[in-house]
Amino acid sequence: MSLPEILPLEVIDKTINQKVLIVLQSNREFEGTLVGFDDFVNVILEDAVEWLIDPEDESRNEKVMQHHGRMLLSGNNIAILVPGGKKTPTEAL
């Protein structure tokens, strides 16, 4: 039995109005509610929170957090988009 084909933009479309975690190529992470996107995967987040990650700190515990309202992220810089948002260690179990 073969699985149905799902295209990347379909996955993103199903994530509208849900929390997402976005990791940029520049070691920055954003979490917020995805309220829009286009064919280039430029995304609009509402209630966005940004973490600046120190690539030298493998524990990833040291993060500088900044709160943003609504923001636009360029699809050219997005490395990973995770539906559901950030998981705490207990949620991941």
From Swiss-Prot:
Compartment list: Nucleus, Nucleolus; Cytoplasm
GO cellular component: Lsm1-7-Pat1 complex; nucleolus; nucleus; P-body; sno(s)RNA-containing ribonucleoprotein complex; spliceosomal complex; U4/U6 snRNP; U4/U6 x U5 tri-snRNP complex
Keywords, ordered alphabetically: Cytoplasm, mRNA processing, mRNA splicing, Nucleus, Ribonucleoprotein, RNA-binding, rRNA processing, Spliceosome, tRNA processing
Pfam families reported in the protein's UniProt record: LSM
SMART domains found in the cross-reference section: Sm
Ranges for domain Sm: 7-87
PANTHER family per the UniProt record, alphabetical: U6 SNRNA-ASSOCIATED PROTEIN, U6 SNRNA-ASSOCIATED SM-LIKE PROTEIN LSM5
Subunit description: Component of the heptameric LSM1-LSM7 complex that forms a seven-membered ring structure with a donut shape. The LSm subunits are arranged in the order LSM1, LSM2, LSM3, LSM6, LSM5, LSM7 and LSM4. Except for LSM1, where a C-terminal helix crosses the ring structure to form additional interactions with LSM3 and LSM6, each subunit interacts only with its two neighboring subunits. The LSM1-LSM7 complex interacts with PAT1; within the complex PAT1 has direct interactions with LSM2 and LSM3. The LSM1-LSM7 complex interacts with XRN1.
Similarity section: Belongs to the snRNP Sm proteins family.
Function description: Component of LSm protein complexes, which are involved in RNA processing and may function in a chaperone-like manner. Component of the cytoplasmic LSM1-LSM7 complex which is involved in mRNA degradation by activating the decapping step. Together with PAT1, the LSM1-LSM7 complex binds to osmotic stress-activated mRNAs to attenuate the osmotic stress response, probably by limiting ribosome access to the mRNA and consequently translation. Component of the nuclear LSM2-LSM8 complex, which is involved in spliceosome assembly.
Designated name of the protein: LSM complex subunit LSM5
Native source organism of the sequence: Saccharomyces cerevisiae (strain ATCC 204508 / S288c) (Baker's yeast)
Gene label: LSM5
